Amino acid sequence: VLLGAWAGVRPADRRILDVGTGTGLIALMMAQRAPEALITGVDVEEVSQARENAAASPWGGRVAFVQCPVQADATKKAPAFLGKYDMIVSNPPFFVDSLTCPDEGRTTARHAVRLPFDQLRDAVVRLLAAEGRFAVILPTDEARRFTDVCRGFLALTRSTGVRTTPRRPVKRLLMEFAHENVSSGLRSDSPPVCSELVVGTGEHEQYTPEYRALTRDFYLKF
């Protein structure tokens, strides 16, 4: 939910891509936030659950799901990848260096096995519109690795460290990238706008006002 609520969607966005869509949650959040946009969700795993979720939602008519690697040749394997996207979002595989799990599905979800960071970067560079944004959420160590992989291609423009409670360390980073553009001064070494978000108060499973404000459109209990 955090990524879908935090990503910098704009009213003018018309095409949005969700990489590693899973159950389609983030894609549907994008459809809710961008009422004029067409959303495409892609995943190497089966997308039938995502399609069912979309069909049961008010936004199903603007959301399509494709079972296909985002690295696919657009002209031959995935016509959905033709053209550019105003916004790309991804909650990609992580734990790059940790041991793989015997369960292949769980391994794919938790490890950068089928979508190495350099291939994700290349796909974003290829598919992102000139003024587009790419939003991603990763554990802190993997976020640093991914930022390094993007140097020379994508510039980090915004970053939010996520803490579960005030006393816990930052566990996740929400990051937004744009195409590096030397002529406009947007470079990989340009300082991003940084902030922190604390999810819970640490008392009786209460959420902070900041987290409630960010996600209230997506939780009935808020």
Report the location of each language-model feature:
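Conserved Class I SAM-dependent methyltransferase catalytic core
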Residues: 114-170
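Conserved SAM/SAH cofactor-binding pocket of Class I
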Residues: 5-102
